[in-house]
């Protein structure tokens, strides 16, 4: 495991990097690009858990994402301090770990449809229950069909930040490879040649067939280990994104429920 590669500041679609002397670090730039994106702003009207609440107290996906990012920044800085001391890293600081985890956390729900997992189920159903949806599937390869029959907000999120937001740029928002790798909790496509590897990182998929080459480029920059054709080991800091999300929804969602009693 090479932490210098895992914290790669390379950006897909860009051949140059910002000089270190600038006031903002690359990971802070990632955070700012996400904050000011229209895709992130759209989370303000998407349900976290409780839809159509008449109370302005209840969280939306937007406020949830901000809270997860705040927790992720703290977790990243704490883990970063330990990693730096253990591995003797030079030129890297705990706040760099905090900033990159915060950026990935900020975008972690950016691909979720309205109504969350229920929205994912509705999209999957449409492709089998409607004539129009079935007609779309007929024009796709077997592997591509699985992208829709198993529609996944995590994969849609990867597509949004790397293609749909700023579509004229290769790499979309052109976030750093480190942020993209940490964002991708499920580093595999919707189909694999054999049985998927065991483990939490492979229970879902994190990118569409059409985005496989781009993620392979990101994984190569980060030095992520291939575990099967079309699947890689998870970036170690991705576990902090998941932890921050769990901490927030297991406490805050209960708080919202209590408020709505």
Name these PLM-found stretches.
Residues 1-23, 35-45, 66, 70-71, ...:
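Sequence-structural signature of the catalytic-core scaffold of metal-dependent phosphohydrolases
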Residues 46-56:
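A short small-residue
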Residues 59-63:
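Low-complexity, highly charged intrinsically disordered N-terminal segments
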């Amino acid at each position: 495991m090479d932490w210098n590669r895992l914290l790669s500041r390379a950006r897909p679609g860009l051949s140059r990097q910002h000089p270190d002397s600038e006031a903002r670090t690359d990971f802070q730039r990632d955070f700012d690009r996400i904050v000011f994106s229209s895709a992130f702003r759209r989370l303000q009207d998407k349900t976290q858990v409780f839809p159509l609440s008449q109370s302005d107290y209840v969280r939306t996906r937007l406020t949830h994402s901000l809270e997860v990012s705040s927790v992720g920044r703290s977790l990243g800085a704490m883990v970063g301090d330990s990693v730096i001391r253990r591995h003797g890293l030079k030129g890297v600081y705990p706040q760099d770990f905090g900033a990159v985890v915060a950026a990935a956390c900020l975008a972690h729900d950016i691909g979720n449809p309205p109504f969350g997992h229920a929205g994912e189920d509705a999209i999957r159903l449409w492709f089998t229950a409607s004539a129009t949806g079935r007609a779309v599937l007929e024009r796709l390869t077997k592997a591509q069909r699985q992208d829709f029959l198993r529609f996944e907000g995590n994969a849609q999120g990867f597509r949004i930040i790397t293609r749909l937001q700023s579509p004229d740029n290769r790499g979309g928002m052109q976030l750093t490879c480190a942020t993209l790798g940490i964002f991708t909790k499920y580093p595999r496509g919707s189909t694999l040649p054999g049985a998927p590897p065991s483990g939490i990182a492979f229970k879902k998929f994190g990118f569409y067939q059409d985005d496989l080459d781009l993620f392979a480029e990101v994984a190569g920059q980060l030095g992520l280990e291939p575990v099967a054709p079309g699947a890689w080991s998870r970036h170690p800091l991705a576990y902090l994104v998941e932890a921050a999300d769990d901490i927030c929804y297991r406490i805050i969602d209960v708080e919202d429920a209590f408020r709505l009693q």
